[in-house]
Amino acid sequence: MKLVVTEPETEALRRYLRAAGGHSLVTSALARVEVPRAVASHGRAATAKATALLATIGQLASSLDLLDEAADLGPAVLRSLDAIHLATARRFGADLRVLVGYDRRLTEAATALGLPVAAPT
C-alpha cells in the first residue's frame, strides 16, 4: 500500500528497499486481492499501479497447509489476513531476511515467533 499511495512512511520505505538491493521481495498471493482493494478508493490509477507493482514481487500461493498454520498462529488479536502473511513469512525459514510491516499486531506476532522485523520510518 505504501508503495502505491503516498503515506508518511513511503519515502523511508523506498530508501530501505533501495538499500536492500539485490534481495527478492516476496509476499503472500493474497496480496493480489488485498492491495488493489486497499487502494481502490484512490482511483483506477492507484489500482493499476498496485497491480503493476505486484507483478514485480514474488508471491507464495496459500495452500491448505499454510492456511491451517495461519489458523493456529497466535495471538488471538492477529487478524486473519495478517496471520496468512505471517505463516507465509515463516515458510521462508532462514532465507527470510526481514518481514517489513507496519501493523503493530502483525509485527509483534512476528517478533514473538523470532522473525526479523522492520518498519522503516
Go through the PLM ranges and name each one.
Residues 9, 65, 105:
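Residue-level recognition of oxygen-bearing side chains
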